[in-house]
Structure formats: C-alpha cells, structure tokens
C-alpha cells in the first residue's frame, strides 16, 4: 500500500525537481494533484516550474557543494532530475549513503546526462543497433573520424555532429562536405553545456521517420515492476529541436515490436521507476536506437491531448509507486510556439483566435525571457485522425503572436 502525506505537514511526501522548465512544470502539477509537496529547483529565478511549486530554489545544479547542501537542507523523499546539467556524481554519493532516492536511479541520471554514457551502454554493452559513431576531443580528431584516417572505418558524409552534452538541439549540425567541418566544430563548442571540447559524430542514417517510444516502468498490483508502452509518437525536428509531434504514428508491426524491444532493453538496464523517452530511427522494418531521456520528453507534450494519463501524470504516478494507464484516448498533435525575438516579459496576441480552432488547447510556459528560437509555448489539438490534428495544431500555433509589450 502506498501512503501519501499532506503538504506543509510533518508527514508530507516531498519531491524535489532538479530543472523546472515546461516539462518539469507539468510534472509538478501532476504531483500536486496527488497531494505531494513540491520543490522546484533551477539555475534562474521564476522558471516555469517554480511558478507553481510549493517551494522554489535557485542554485547552480552542476555545483556538487550547492546540490548537496540543498538536498540535505530540504530532505526530499525523491529527487527527480529534469535536465542533464547536474552534478550526477554527487547524486550517486548521496544515494549510496541512503540520504535520498534519485529517479529513476543516480546511475541512470549519470549515464544519460551526456550522449557518451548512453551511446556506449546501448551500442557496446547491450549490442543495440545504432548509427556508426565516434567521440572526438578536437577538430582534428573530428576530421580524422570522418575521413577514416584514425585507423577506424570512415564515418563519411553526410554526418551529424553534436556536443556530448546539450539539449534542444543546441550545437547540433548536419555536415554535407569537408567545408562544413570547421563550422560544425565551432557551433558544437558554442552550444554545449558542461562537457566542453567533446563531440559525437554520427554517420547519417537514411531513415523513413523517427519516433519517440515513451516507456514507463511502474509497479503493478503485485508490487513488481512492469513495463508499459505508449503509442508511438512521430515528430519533426529542425536543427535537432522538435517543432511538431503527433500520436499515434503508424508503424509496421515488426518495426513497432523492435522499437519496444529496444526500449525495454535500455530501460531495464537503467532500472528504477518512471517514464523514459526513447528516441528511435525507423526505415521499413529496421530500427536504430538514437537516445533516451529518463524523464518526460518534449515530443511527449502531445500526450496532454491524446492520452488518458499524460506523460507527466504517468511519470508522477510511476515514481510514487502507483499504477499507470498508458493507453491512447484519441489521436492528436502538438506544434511549437517560438518566442521569435530576444526580449523579457513577452505578451501573446491571438490567444482567442488560436483557441477558436476546433479541438485545440494551449500551454504558454511563462518563461521570463525569450530568445528567437526559445520554445515559449505549444499548441495542442485532438481530432478524429492525426492529419487533421496536425493541421489544427499548426493553425492554432500560427495564430499566437509573441511580442514585446
């Protein structure tokens, strides 16, 4: 039996989120609906999740001393990483000492904090199909990996270069020829977060489409961990950042089964409880592993319109040891609303027109500062079929006009 407490009481169930952006905000809301006392942590004040949490804390989460001091002061029952740029060795230390439980595990947080740990796990430990890849510490090493002059098979062109640690496509670029190498290296160095000076270069896979397979590890009625799969989510990315997603994405049954087999292999190894976003490339019946996030995924925002329990509710329930329902309610789609400018305190025109589009909803994230390509909101649409939902979501998103006041 799972027992939950009352916020602000001595018996409160306390959950701390490390990272409080738009995804964390929805997780916090889902936790609060279950009576959980929430602590939203971020690197800047008034982050979206901090606006709705019981407590807001601002620290440098990649600083081990600051992270340790905060966890020891707040004494949460669970620590839930929502971003990559965290001092994960400190989380491992605190978890090993029995100070706190990390979701899904501190090891999973460390392995997925950058592209190297999880790629080596998937390809080298689990033997899963991935694109050909190499890790490089200099522009010279990058050039050698592409050319094959490092004694290994050439990655060749086209290829994709990404910082070992970055998010939302920052620092990622596609290279079509030798003239792109220097630009790609410089762009990756500018876009990386913590592990400066190291990139992954991947051979380009000629895939038909890419999906996110949301995978949930949750306790069943017998107390044992069970794996649940949401319907596959299709999405379109531009420069590594999602701009549109929809659910369900039609797949060949064999490809769907392979996708779920891969997702289960990775999430079983990472362990713990919670929702994972497993990214996969698909061509016909072939499936390649790309990446995994041990937390709700940005493309999964569509589940706010499509599932009985959104990815955020699934995550909240799973980490609390509660049963989950990952089934689809109806087809739907999401479309991103960008800030379109560098400014603080934007206002949004056209909200009424957007919500007049049939079957639509909006999430405006409340980010205090906008950039040209910063995701400031998302339009959601549900419909009888995916194509209509995609049309309506894009139409609604286009009617929202962010501007300076």
Curated annotation (Swiss-Prot):
The lineage of its organism: Bacteria, Pseudomonadati, Pseudomonadota, Betaproteobacteria, Burkholderiales. Its EC number is 6.3.1.21. The keyword Nucleotide-binding applies. Involved in the de novo purine biosynthesis. Catalyzes the transfer of formate to 5-phospho-ribosyl-glycinamide (GAR), producing 5-phospho-ribosyl-N-formylglycinamide (FGAR). Formate is provided by PurU via hydrolysis of 10-formyl-tetrahydrofolate. Belongs to the PurK/PurT family. HAMAP family: PurT (MF_01643). NCBIfam families: PRK09288.1 (NF006766), purT (TIGR01142). Pathway: Purine metabolism; IMP biosynthesis via de novo pathway; N(2)-formyl-N(1)-(5-phospho-D-ribosyl)glycinamide from N(1)-(5-phospho-D-ribosyl)glycinamide (formate route): step 1/1. GO terms for biological process: 'de novo' IMP biosynthetic process. GO terms for cellular component: cytosol. Pfam families: ATP-grasp, PurT_C, RS_preATP-grasp-like. Signal peptide: none annotated. This is Formate-dependent phosphoribosylglycinamide formyltransferase. It is an enzyme of class 6 (ligase). N(1)-(5-phospho-beta-D-ribosyl)glycinamide binds at residues 22-23, 82, 298, 367, 374-375. The gene is purT. Homodimer. It comes from Delftia acidovorans (strain DSM 14801 / SPH-1).
């Amino acid at each position: 039996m799972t027992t939950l407490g009352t916020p602000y009481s001595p018996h409160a169930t306390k959950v701390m989120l490390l990272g409080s952006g738009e995804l964390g905000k929805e997780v916090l809301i889902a936790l609060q609906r279950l009576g959980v006392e929430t602590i939203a942590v971020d690197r800047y004040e008034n982050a979206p999740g901090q606006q709705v949490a019981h407590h807001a804390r601002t620290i440098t989460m990649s600083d081990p001393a600051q992270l340790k001091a905060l966890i020891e002061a707040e004494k949460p029952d669970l620590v839930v990483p929502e971003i990559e740029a965290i001092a994960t060795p400190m989380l491992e230390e605190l978890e090993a000492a029995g100070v706190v439980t990390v979701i899904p595990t501190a090891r999973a947080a460390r392995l997925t904090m950058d592209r190297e740990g999880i790629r080596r796990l998937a390809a080298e430990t689990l033997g899963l199909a991935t694109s050909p890849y190499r890790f490089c510490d200099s522009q010279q090493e990058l050039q050698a990996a592409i050319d094959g002059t490092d004694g290994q098979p050439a990655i060749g062109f086209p290829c994709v270069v990404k910082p070992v640690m970055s998010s939302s496509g920052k620092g990622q670029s596609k290279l079509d020829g030798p003239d792109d190498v220097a630009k790609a290296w410089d762009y990756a160095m500018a876009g990386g977060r913590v592990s400066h000076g190291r990139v992954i270069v991947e051979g380009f896979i000629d895939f038909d489409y890419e999906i996110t397979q949301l995978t949930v590890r949750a306790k069943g009625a017998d107390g044992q961990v069970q794996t649940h799969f949401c319907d596959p989510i299709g999405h379109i990315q531009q420069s590594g950042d999602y701009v549109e997603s929809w659910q369900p994405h039609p797949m060949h049954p064999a490809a769907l089964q392979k996708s779920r087999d891969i997702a289960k292999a990775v999430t079983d190894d990472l362990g713990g409880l919670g929702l994972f976003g497993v990214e996969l490339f698909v061509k016909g019946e072939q499936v390649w592993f790309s990446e995994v996030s041990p937390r709700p995924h940005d493309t999964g925002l569509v589940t706010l319109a499509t599932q009985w329990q959104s990815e955020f509710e699934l995550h909240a329930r799973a980490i609390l040891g509660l049963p989950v329902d990952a089934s689809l309610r109806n087809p739907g789609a999401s479309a991103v609303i960008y800030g379109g400018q560098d400014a603080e305190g934007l206002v949004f025109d056209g909200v009424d027109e957007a919500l007049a589009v049939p079957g639509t909803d909006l999430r405006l994230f409340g980010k205090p500062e906008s950039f040209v390509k910063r995701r400031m909101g998302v339009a959601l649409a549900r419909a009888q079929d995916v194509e209509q939902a995609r049309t309506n979501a894009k139409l609604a998103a286009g009617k929202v006009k962010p501007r300076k006041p």
